[in-house]
Amino acid sequence: MQNSKRRRWRLGAVFCVLVSILLACGVREHGPWTETFDEAGDWQVSADAAASVTVADGVLRIHVFELGQVAWAAAGRTYSDFRLTVEATQVSGPDDNEYGVLTRMAGDTQFYVFSISGDGYARIARYNNGSWSILGPDWVPSDVIHQGAAPNVLEVEARGGTFVFSVNGTQVLQVEDAQLTKGDIGLYAGAFNEANVVIDFDNLEVQPLQ
């Protein structure tokens, strides 16, 4: 695991640079949802010199070509309180990476980030109008995260200002934060000192909570 201050600085910098290139079009109110990525649907597939998002062979794949870059795709759906699960698999690339889920997104200005790394760390952060905040411990190690080229099941439960982040059925972080109340969801991946991070996402499920 690399120095957490370096990782945090890079996260803020690269999101500001690339945030607009891979957003899906439109935001709609939705209920329970299952996504198996048999087709692109509302997910915007796109590519530039830094990264690509594709939907093929039953997965959404994010390939980050350049070091120090992050890319995402948004679903174009609005949720407030919900439980989300998704299978995320590091296909190739360095373990010093990050990938995960974005929630309560308002375009490129506001969102929560639920992250794991290929070397076994987890974190929750918030981006709000140009300001980054780490919620809870910064890059906490967890033995439940499958390291390297392996699948992990990510689960995010958002209920009011309480967020629970679980990996492979075990809670790794719980935080309180009431700044963002609803918004879109997204999937993302990022590279740090080495390029060519490839992450596949599949079997996304979202269940609204009462």
Locate the predicted segments by residue:
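C-terminal motif of bacterial Sec signal peptides marking the signal peptidase cleavage site
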Residues: L22-A24
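Short carbohydrate-recognition loop motifs
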Residues: A51-V70, A122-R123, Y188
